[in-house]
Amino acid sequence: MSQFSRRKFLLTAGGTAAAALWLNACGSNNSSTDTTGSTSTPAPSGTSGGDAPEVKGVTLGFIALTDAAPVIIALEKGLFAKYGLPDTKVVKQTSWAVTRDNLELGSDRGGIDGAHILSPMPYLLTAGTITKSQKPLPMYILARLNTQGQGISLSNEFLAEKVQIKDPKLKAIADQKKASGKLLKAAVTFPGGTHDLWMRYWLAANGIDPNNDADLVVIPPPQMVANMQTGTMDTFCVGEPWNARLVNKKLGYTAAVTGELWKFHPEKALTIRADWADKNPKATMALLKAVQEAQIWCEDPANLDELCQITAQDKYFKTSVEDIKPRLQGDIDYGDGRSVKNSDLRMRFWSENASFPYKSHDLWFLTEDIRWGYLPASTDTKALIEKVNRSDLWREAAKAIGREQDIPASDSRGVETFFDGVTFDPENPQAYLDGLKFKAIKA
């Protein structure tokens, strides 16, 4: 298929949560689960009188994915309260489409102020290309929540092929399906989001045109495994713990973890509505400091068991610790006979500058969204990044919590190299685009 149509996008982005999505669009918040209230005693206040937030709380959304842990932990360990935001709500969203809709509503209309989100989405919202109103919704990215920790998995129908990251057997499967009158069905979590871009990159690098040789469908992350079981798709790209759960249930196997595609790649972000942040600058700083501290906590191996026990609860991920813990500590059972221990491709929350929102990474996301027609070729990427990416606030918050030594010197991480040998130079994104075989650029 050439592209997700807007109609198909609106109908499928919520997957089987469509009913909840339409209720939400009408102003109901039934598609979200409020997990307000932590189980821990708040730490001593981290604010002084002059730093006191303008409000007592913020309403944040999250999807049941391991990389939502910093937002959840900031609530559970009393870090929001520590920085003067004791009334903060952390609300489960059923899909990225619901997250989008609730951000558009804002908390004053029953929605949310900010969220754990796919890194490209704040840009697509700010550009107005995915809002239901088709109007721009200015957003800020305050931090990256994690790097790595996603996977591309296949159905057991293709277990004999044992497809890996760079593998001619993948194209053979796609060619066989096309010859039989079908297309390789690949599930992603949101059009133009990270999982969509990882899947498209993987297919294209293996000689498969995502627009003509595959059928990309949208399924919410927590519903991926159930849909694989019913044969909805042949392959999917999603964050943990859902690849691990697929393997644990013996319904499929992981071809590659996304760190194999691009080592230490950026993934989710902490986003906030720009109007909320501009109205509440001290509360925004408090929010950022709390999440940064939570990321540091999540990175500490001593906290791994507690992190898994907290997030496995029904109100958060509704899965087992066994689905979360192994891959989070770098122990990867691919489900096809391969396994690794203590892999450096595990999810990072703070180490290796995981939390810093590099503008060069956002440029790659925008370049890929231009590549596949989610943004027009005329997009002023530099201006859009300067509008959305608030690395200045990240630096200020990191300094305030005593982590000045972790502040990068530059907003660019420099040239990035992908598994197929292709490089992305943020100083020359056009050269990167020009060198790609498969693309669907729109004027």
From Swiss-Prot:
A lipid is attached at C26 (N-palmitoyl cysteine). The keyword Membrane applies. The N-terminus is blocked. GO terms for cellular component: plasma membrane. Coiled coil: none annotated. Disruption phenotype: Mutant does not grow under low concentrations of nitrate. Mutant is totally defective in nitrate uptake but shows significant nitrite uptake. Part of the ABC transporter complex NrtABCD involved in nitrate uptake. The complex is probably also involved in nitrite transport. NrtA is the substrate-binding protein. Binds both nitrate and nitrite with high affinity. This is Nitrate/nitrite binding protein NrtA. It comes from Synechococcus elongatus (strain ATCC 33912 / PCC 7942 / FACHB-805) (Anacystis nidulans R2). The lineage of its organism: Bacteria, Bacillati, Cyanobacteriota, Cyanophyceae, Synechococcales. The gene is nrtA.
